[in-house]
Amino acid sequence: MQFNNKPLIGVVHLPPLPGSPGYKGELDEVIDRAISDAAKYQEAGFDAIILENYGDFPYSKTVGKETVSAFSVVANEVKREIALPLGINVLRNDCIAAYSIAYSIKADFIRVNVLTGVAFTDQGIVEGCARELAELRTRLPSRIDVLADVHVKHATHFSNFENALLDTIERGGADAVIVTGSRTGSEVDIQELITAKRISPVPVLVGSGVNPRNIKLFWRYSDGFIVGTWVKEGGRTINEVSIERATKLAKLVKSLREG
């Protein structure tokens, strides 16, 4: 991934996949929805997309083989239709599955929610997977970037934010870090974002709560934006992408780039 232009990354929230409680047995419908949302991001002028198994709640810490297989099929179909750089995030924290899928379809990056440290989540205690991921990257070398959350949302953290950020980079091997609010769609703490930008030797992305009202404030303190709630119909995460909202945000980003 290139971050010199502060990329706008759209989240494709997938409906339930095989292996999750909500799966209805229609993978073709999942594929159609994913391609439709991805195409809207592309038409709107976004710079990249990331696929996420958002519909698989309640989440497990890692996913089964059937989910990995189905996710790979969906991601490959999206890649065939969409020209944008593509990322993979496998909830809740399956970095091995995410990298494996990304490697198999030649995706560009993955997102890891807990790369280092410990997060107290609704799935219980989630531990970092940096060592396992580093070993896999050695066995399957590629140019896939690792974008890692620092104090990921929907979790409680007892570590110091600055130490957690530096550990994620220096000990976890993150190629970029992500700062989020406390929940999906919630705004980031501006002081945490400023701190991250000040001390991080790698790009810093805003990972939640981005909208036309606050992106101007975040612009100077970030190197990119991951957006998935405000750009949906009615601003609801589970809805389809709104081409009008996505276009509005993309045009605003373009104007900010132009100064």
UniProtKB/Swiss-Prot annotation:
SUPFAM superfamilies in alphabetical order: Ribulose-phoshate binding barrel
CDD domains found in the cross-reference section: TIM_phosphate_binding
Pfam family, one: BtpA
UniProt similarity note: Belongs to the BtpA family.
Cited NCBIfam families: thylakoid_BtpA
Protein name: Uncharacterized protein PH1209
